[in-house]
Amino acid sequence: MDFRVIGDTYRYGVRVSAIVEKDGKLLTYKVEDQNHLVGGAILVGEASREAVVREVKEELGVVCEVEELMFVVENRFDYKGELHHMIEFHYKVTLIGEVPSHTLDEGKYECEWIDLQRLSEYDIRPQYLIKELPLWKAGIKQIDIGIE
C-alpha cells in the first residue's frame, strides 16, 4: 500500500525521487510540457532508500546505486483546487544500465536528458530544482515550499 492519502479536496503522502546526472545533464521524463524526475510514493513499511531503487527499476527497468540523500522537501501546493502536501526525499543515484527511450510504467513517457546549465528553460517538477540543484555541493538540504 502506498504511503499516501487521497481525499476529495486533498492529497498527502511521502515520496522519493531519483536525481540522475550524467555528462552535465539531468535525467527527466516528459508529461505534456513538463519534465519530471523518476520517482513515486513510498510503500508503507518501506525505507526511502529502498523506495528509490524500486521506483527506478519499475520506471526505467534498470538497477541503480543510491549515492546520497540530497534534499528533504516539504512541498505544499494547490493543483486544480486540490491541496497537496508531500514529504519528499530526493536521492542522488547512479544508473547501472542504459536508460530506455520511454518509461516502462503505464504512461510510457519519453525520457529526456536536460543540460544542467539550461534548467531554467524547462518546466521542471519539482520546480525548486531549477534554483537548488546547481547550488548543491554535498550534504542534505532541507527545503520548505509553501502554498503561493
Which sequence ranges carry the predicted segments?
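Short connector loops at helix/strand junctions that flank enzyme active sites
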Residues: 13, 21, 37, 64, ...
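Conserved Nudix-box catalytic region and its N-terminal flanking loop in Nudix hydrolases
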Residues: 22-58
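A short coil-to-beta-strand element that immediately follows conserved catalytic motifs
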Residues: 63-72
